UniProtKB/Swiss-Prot annotation:
Protein source organism: Escherichia coli (strain K12)
Highest taxon in the source lineage: Bacteria
NCBIfam families tied to this protein: PxpC_5OPro (NF045499), urea_amlyse_rel (TIGR00724)
Catalytic activity: 5-oxo-L-proline + ATP + 2 H2O = L-glutamate + ADP + phosphate + H(+)
Known role: Catalyzes the cleavage of 5-oxoproline to form L-glutamate coupled to the hydrolysis of ATP to ADP and inorganic phosphate.
Protein name (record): 5-oxoprolinase subunit C
EC code: 3.5.2.9
Family: Belongs to the PxpC family.
Reported phenotype of the disruption mutant: Deletion of the gene slows growth on minimal medium with ammonium as nitrogen source.
Keyword vocabulary terms for this entry: ATP-binding, Hydrolase, Nucleotide-binding
Xref: InterPro entries: 5-oxoprolinase_subunit, CT_A_B, Cyclophilin-like_dom_sf, PxpC
Signal peptide segment: none
GO terms under cellular component: cytosol
Amino acid sequence: MLKIIRAGMYTTVQDGGRHGFRQSGISHCGALDMPALRIANLLVGNDANAPALEITLGQLTVEFETDGWFALTGAGCEARLDDNAVWTGWRLPMKAGQRLTLKRPQHGMRSYLAVAGGIDVPPVMGSCSTDLKVGIGGLEGRLLKDGDRLPIGKSKRDSMEAQGVKQLLWGNRIRALPGPEYHEFDRASQDAFWRSPWQLSSQSNRMGYRLQGQILKRTTDRELLSHGLLPGVVQVPHNGQPIVLMNDAQTTGGYPRIACIIEADMYHLAQIPLGQPIHFVQCSLEEALKARQDQQRYFEQLAWRLHNEN
């Protein structure tokens, strides 16, 4: 078992996400920084998309109630296992009774804690990810709180050694494709979207990142029919300030879509702190597909290397 001593401000169970239910209004959910989740899981011998803890802004303390292995990835924060420093991107042994403590991150926003065997909570609609809107997944469909105890599954590996891997770097230059209504915005707004810095609003959450910057204006007042939405779509509501839809976003909407962030760059957004400028970089569909293929190839190679170690 894994006992939550101090839950932090926003800690949930997340995995690779909930697929195939968008027609029923069920959001994708899942880890916001998918590369960090996958690296943590692969380090401890789990499936890449196994359930783990997503910890926003640190300030977490957990107690391990069984021996095993864990890995901490994502945001760079000061972490300690009892009195020993813990590096992110490393697989390390844990003993029953030991406590892992995370302070507020110095770099990034979200950390991921995976344990060998995974967080063993029951899947709902094919996923263990917490959906706070619907109240499903994770532990009772809610944020974790002090005193919670989470079961740990059986490890797939009989033996391991301490090991670290290089994490994917994140930055504030985010590649995106023009959206379906891109050409409904005036030229000044199109230029501003790509050339002007955007600030992440404090009203941002796992549903959407609200951006602050130059007001974007359309050249038409036509109303749009409701359309399907996915994480990464950049909507522009009536106030002219963009909203980037994130993993917990609604599945339909009617605001104009000025752009869509490429899948391979979504993890950058998960780690950008409030107040840091965001710059969008226009790319082609071919570049977006290549970026996704390169990222998939990286994880295939990492999984092979870790599976065949020793």
